[in-house]
């Protein structure tokens, strides 16, 4: 039975990946905020890796704020971001190099490593130009993976675009829309205030993205891979699709107010051609199917069949 350490096991991706790995007969060792080790302490990480010598390690832990989260203290946010998004990655890579060289490592990077790219669609060759603390710390983690890869460590990187599931935390716009639809349908609310209806994103379904992670570590060689749907959608489209699925007209309930945004959003769209060619990966649901799955999990009563037109 293969052993996998899942770092960030309590988050959306960690929970979904752990379920997937167990379904494939893995022994999963979860590492989260409450232990069993402190990932910012290199000695703790080294001891865990040396003891388990796992087949795979998935580095999914992250410090991230959404565009509609309250503004955090910039210095404190930087310290936390670099500790978790960068230094913890180095601790695991170093531990693997020293104590378990056969271990394969996956690092969850982010489309935010591209910052404000010159191209409308990004791939693995797009220059790293992060503009946020989150993006900078994730880009640093990516570069450390490349460095250790050049020294023989099997360190693959998934550059993940926005991906949603019922486990997404409330601060993200997808969760705000879904929760509002359910409350409105139940008569518990009437209006939803969103920061920018024209804001664009490349949204995918999180269970598909953790499947990509497992496939990436199953390849013969380590590399970087964009994981994305490749389709640009607006917040307006997300709201329209969600309300329509519940038999509601979004225009009756949605109000736009830019004041709720804490930072401007940057439209990022990914090209996952390399991933598809290498692994055969394909999204299992389209955009409408994803939105309906989120609503169904939240308890909404749905209408129609939900196919993208």
Place the predicted regions along the sequence by residue.
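C-terminal substrate-binding subdomain of Rossmann-fold SDR/epimerase-dehydratase oxidoreductases
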Residues: 8, 18, 181-309
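NAD(P)H-binding glycine-rich loop region in Rossmannoid oxidoreductase-like domains
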Residues: 43-84
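Adenosine-cofactor binding site in Rossmann-like domains, unifying the SAM/SAH pocket
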Residues: 28-44
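SDR active-site strand-loop-helix element
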Residues: 7, 31, 57-61, 105-111, ...
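Conserved mid-core alpha-helix of short-chain dehydrogenase/reductase
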Residues: 44, 87-95, 208
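Glycine-rich "substrate-gating" loop/helix at the edge of Rossmann-like oxidoreductase active sites
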Residues: 131, 160-172, 196-207, 231
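Catalytic helix-loop patch of NAD(P)-dependent Rossmann-fold dehydrogenases
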Residues: 73-91, 103-104, 112-159, 164-165
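N-terminal Rossmann NAD(P)H-binding glycine-rich loop of SDR-like oxidoreductase domains
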Residues: 4-23
């Amino acid at each position: 039975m293969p052993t996998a350490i899942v770092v960030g096991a309590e988050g959306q991706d960690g929970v979904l990946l752990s379920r997937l790995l167990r379904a494939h007969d893995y022994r999963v060792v979860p590492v989260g905020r409450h232990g069993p080790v402190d990932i910012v302490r290199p000695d703790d990480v080294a001891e865990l890796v040396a003891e388990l010598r796992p087949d795979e390690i998935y580095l999914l832990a992250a410090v991230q704020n959404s565009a509609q989260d309250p503004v955090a203290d910039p210095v404190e946010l930087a310290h936390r971001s670099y500790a978790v998004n960068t230094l913890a990655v180095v601790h695991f890579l170093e531990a693997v190099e020293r104590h378990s060289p056969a271990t394969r490592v996956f690092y969850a990077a982010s489309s935010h490593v591209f910052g404000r790219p010159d191209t409308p669609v990004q791939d693995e060759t797009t220059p790293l130009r992060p503009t946020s603390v989150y993006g900078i710390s994730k880009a640093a983690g990516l570069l450390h993976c490349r460095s250790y890869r050049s020294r023989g460590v099997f360190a693959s990187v998934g550059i993940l675009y926005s991906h949603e599931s019922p486990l997404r935390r409330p601060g993200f716009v997808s969760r705000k829309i879904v929760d509002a639809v359910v409350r409105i349908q139940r008569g518990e609310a009437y209006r939803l205030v969103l920061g920018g209806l024209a804001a664009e994103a490349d949204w995918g379904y999180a269970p598909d993205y953790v499947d990509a992670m497992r496939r990436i570590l199953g390849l013969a060689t380590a590399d970087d891979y964009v994981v994305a749907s490749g389709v640009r959608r607006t917040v307006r489209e997300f709201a329209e699709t969600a309300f329509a699925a519940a038999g509601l007209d979004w225009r009756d309930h949605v109000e736009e107010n830019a004041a709720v945004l804490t930072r401007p959003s940057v439209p990022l769209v990914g090209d996952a051609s390399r991933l598809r060619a290498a692994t055969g990966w394909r999204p299992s649901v389209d955009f409408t199917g994803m939105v309906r799955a989120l609503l169904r999990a939240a308890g909404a009563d749905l209408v129609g069949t939900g196919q993208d037109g």
